[in-house]
UniProtKB/Swiss-Prot annotation:
GO terms for molecular function: transmembrane signaling receptor activity. This is Kremen protein 2. Disulfide bonds join 36-119, 60-100, 89-114, 219-245. Glycans are attached at residues 49, 222, 244, 351. The lineage of its organism: Eukaryota, Metazoa, Chordata, Craniata, Vertebrata. Receptor for Dickkopf proteins. Cooperates with DKK1/2 to inhibit Wnt/beta-catenin signaling by promoting the endocytosis of Wnt receptors LRP5 and LRP6. Plays a role in limb development; attenuates Wnt signaling in the developing limb to allow normal limb patterning and can also negatively regulate bone formation.
Amino acid sequence: MGTQALQGFLFLLFLPLLQPRGASAGSLHSPGLSECFQVNGADYRGHQNRTGPRGAGRPCLFWDQTQQHSYSSASDPHGRWGLGAHNFCRNPDGDVQPWCYVAETEEGIYWRYCDIPSCHMPGYLGCFVDSGAPPALSGPSGTSTKLTVQVCLRFCRMKGYQLAGVEAGYACFCGSESDLARGRLAPATDCDQICFGHPGQLCGGDGRLGVYEVSVGSCQGNWTAPQGVIYSPDFPDEYGPDRNCSWALGPPGAALELTFRLFELADPRDRLELRDAASGSLLRAFDGARPPPSGPLRLGTAALLLTFRSDARGHAQGFALTYRGLQDAAEDPEAPEGSAQTPAAPLDGANVSCSPRPGAPPAAIGARVFSTVTAVSVLLLLLLGLLRPLRRRSCLLAPGKGPPALGASRGPRRSWAVWYQQPRGVALPCSPGDPQAEGSAAGYRPLSASSQSSLRSLISAL
């Protein structure tokens, strides 16, 4: 690309700007407020040590005292998952959000998710009430059994909308700022349903929309705000093969500072280049074999062009980087006050579809990801041989923490049966292969699908 083309690209007109809102959970306008840059909070390294914010909820156990469970500081000797001699919430197994153990033994509910207000990736605006009349987001909508966050973002980006909302695990809605102006925030824990197309992502809840800015995971953009966040294409899904994406970066100031919050490329053929926008000269290049520095990276240019290319086989989590403009190349690295992100949200030029389609599963980070799909299959197998001492009662399963394994109910992946008969019920451990097992639960209603959306709603439905 020639110098004139680079200059022209830098100064492309950009779409109307999204204004910051105090209600936003993790807006791209305020990246400094977020402690997480992955959609499931696997990168959370904060200090919340209770399941609720500001002292609410149950206290977490110390990770160096949980050897009886599947995850402890002993299982993370290199600190890859952030475990250690502390009791802060973490996500060592790639679950949908950080969690912690709350009980010494695996009797009853021995772990819980953590509600961490500061752990929402920039670009996620929060959980909103959707009563349906009128809808929380008034633009086009669709459903998909393979819905992921990025599938919905791509759909709404293609339609020309600023915001995308995921609901009930399978529904996607598009909208604009005016919709959120009359919207009503819901508790973050209300958006607790797993995306049908990705076991490691949450897609809203029953009557609850998880709302995102569509610029998240965009393949191109023109970024001129004093500071902000740029994600790899298709984020929070993995980037796909043969991606060729560019972002023009020109915040006010004489120099730039970049900090990579996440960087995971598949191999040396997947490459991110940083070029001076005026001259086109290559300043730095990173790939799967040559990652960027862990700390801030300063560049003596006021305008930058980032280009990412993946090969025909490329699939990995990608990258998330924060940037800020510096008034002087020697400026001390201190975040400016009151800065705001002003992303452009142009339509992706490639890999877009008129209807939601499946995204790729997230890449394994160390040993933390255990397939939820496999776990569900194991649980279904266990269901066939569960206890049947109580006639005409139903058994519903909720996963424990640990690698999937068949065997006794006290195994590392134990399951829990909810035996209930209206109007009351009780949670009991399932013991596969019980000789008293008997037939189906004729005459007793099953829990509704919405009541099975998470461990929390499953137990609270009793």
